[in-house]
Amino acid sequence: MLKIKLEKTTFENAKAECSLVFIVNKDFSHAWVKNKELLETFKYEGEGVFLDQENKILYAGVKEDDVHLLRESACLAVRTLKKLAFKSVKVGVYTCGTHSKDNALLENLKALFLGLKLGLYEYDTFKSNKKESVLKEAIVALELHKPCEKTCANSLEKSAKEALKYAEIMTESLNIVRDLVNTPPMIGTPVYMAEVAQKVAKENHLEIHVYDEKFLEEKKMNAFLAVNKASLGVNPPRLIHLVYKPKKAKKKIALVGKGLTYDCGGLSLKPADYMVTMKADKGGGSAVIGLLNVLAKLGVEAEVHGIIGATENMIGPAAYKPDDILISKEGKSIEVRNTDAEGRLVLADCLSYAQDLNPDVIVDFATLTGACVVGLGEFTSAIMGHNEELKNLFETSGLESGELLAKLPFNRHLKKLIESKIADVCNISSSRYGGAITAGLFLNEFIRDEFKDKWLHIDIAGPAYVEKEWDVNSFGASGAGVRACTAFVEELLKKA
């Protein structure tokens, strides 16, 4: 991980092997830009990166005056620098976006530091010849690249320290999630997932309970159990329950995650091409583990419960079947018409378990539907639920964190598509349309009336795992949901 060192000095006086200078909104006028003739010769107009080898300066373009583009550009710059031979880089402080906001400086620093730190991530566990980055340190000169109000300058050091703490915690947590999601299925089993959760619990002094199939049977979590039937003798299920309890808690929050460590579709077998990347079906459960790490280290004033349903969905003689009828923990019967709609079965029982804790807010995370990716693209998560205020808060705070989110509305017509003639509800829609919403409506069937306005469903199927670099995310797992939910919890507690 890149070490960031704060120094109370000017950018010119800071010492490092190379310099990183951002060109914000194609503005070449500030003093840190050197050798403008060279930039003009090579027609560098402030987009992408450009290396001035003579002066050892890497220029990185920030296309617009936008804090999210600053974060992305910082990440791109580090990705470029790690291919070079510099051990250290110096950078100043930039302010982008809405300068009138009270926390504008802090948010810019968070974005800068997080972008720098995430730029070094690469999942290379199984590479024979690992290429370790020479770049080890970023020196941040506590000098603003352009004048601002005196109050802004006076708060620079304090804001920088707070932002650095956030960036270090968030980077560590995102990388825990990324590593877990990227772990191949022969290693990343339900038991392995529980072991990762136990490490996080131990480090943060969290309470943790890991339950096996016997507990699931006792609690009548039959929908969850059914999904695991083909794997029971080899990779049994685990219900993981993490608990963070601060001395002072304004809210009790339950975070629920789908932890499908591998999903071949069960007897409703996926085509071969669609099985590839299904190690990422544990993205929701992994995000919950990462969130407990973030929220505990930040010391938020909320009692937080992280509940993960970890299992495989495989084929075998004991596998559950289309036409099965399952009795869930809530007592509702489920007609199974497609065994590849399994994540919602696991979540149904886990959400029931979460409601028994009587939380003030419930948020579930799942790589639930391909339909969500079709509708919103691979970079955007969907928000569903009944409480407009809660949905709006998650969307606005999540967007400010740098994640992309959009609300999808429930409606009575789509609800009819999951009706069953022989059970209380069907696990698959009778129509090919609106699949992300009908999956959310299925989960809604297991939310008790008193919790309807306390529950949010986040479908992270698109951004949880993308096979290319984008924004601050490397090839593979991104840690989708972690930044957004952290911001949501912080804003929720401000209103408490």
UniProtKB/Swiss-Prot annotation:
Look up the EC number in the record and give it. 3.4.11.1, 3.4.11.10
Keyword Protease applies: yes
Catalyzed reaction equations: Release of an N-terminal amino acid, Xaa-|-Yaa-, in which Xaa is preferably Leu, but may be other amino acids including Pro although not Arg or Lys, and Yaa may be Pro. Amino acid amides and methyl esters are also readily hydrolyzed, but rates on arylamides are exceedingly low; Release of an N-terminal amino acid, preferentially leucine, but not glutamic or aspartic acids
Annotated positions binding Mn(2+) 2: 258, 263, 281, 342
Name the source's superkingdom.
Bacteria
Active site residues of this protein: 270, 344
Q: Which GO terms describe its biological process?
A: proteolysis
The UniProt entry, under InterPro entries, shows: Leucine_aapep/pepB, Macro_dom-like, Peptidase_M17_C, Peptidase_M17_leu_NH2_pept, Peptidase_M17_N
GO cellular component, as recorded: cytoplasm
Q: Which UniProt keywords apply?
A: Aminopeptidase, Cytoplasm, Hydrolase, Manganese, Metal-binding, Protease
Gene3D superfamilies xrefs: Leucine Aminopeptidase, subunit E, domain 1, Zn peptidases
The record's principal subcellular location, in a coarse class, is cytoplasm
Spell out the subcellular localization from the entry.
Cytoplasm
Q: Could you give a GO molecular-function term held by this entry?
A: metalloaminopeptidase activity
PANTHER family recorded for this chain? CYTOSOL AMINOPEPTIDASE (PTHR11963:SF23), LEUCINE AMINOPEPTIDASE-RELATED (PTHR11963)
Q: What is its biological role?
A: Presumably involved in the processing and regular turnover of intracellular proteins. Catalyzes the removal of unsubstituted N-terminal amino acids from various peptides.
Spell out the family assignment given in the record's similarity comment: Belongs to the peptidase M17 family.
Designated name of the protein: Probable cytosol aminopeptidase
Q: What is the protein's species of origin?
A: Helicobacter pylori (strain G27)
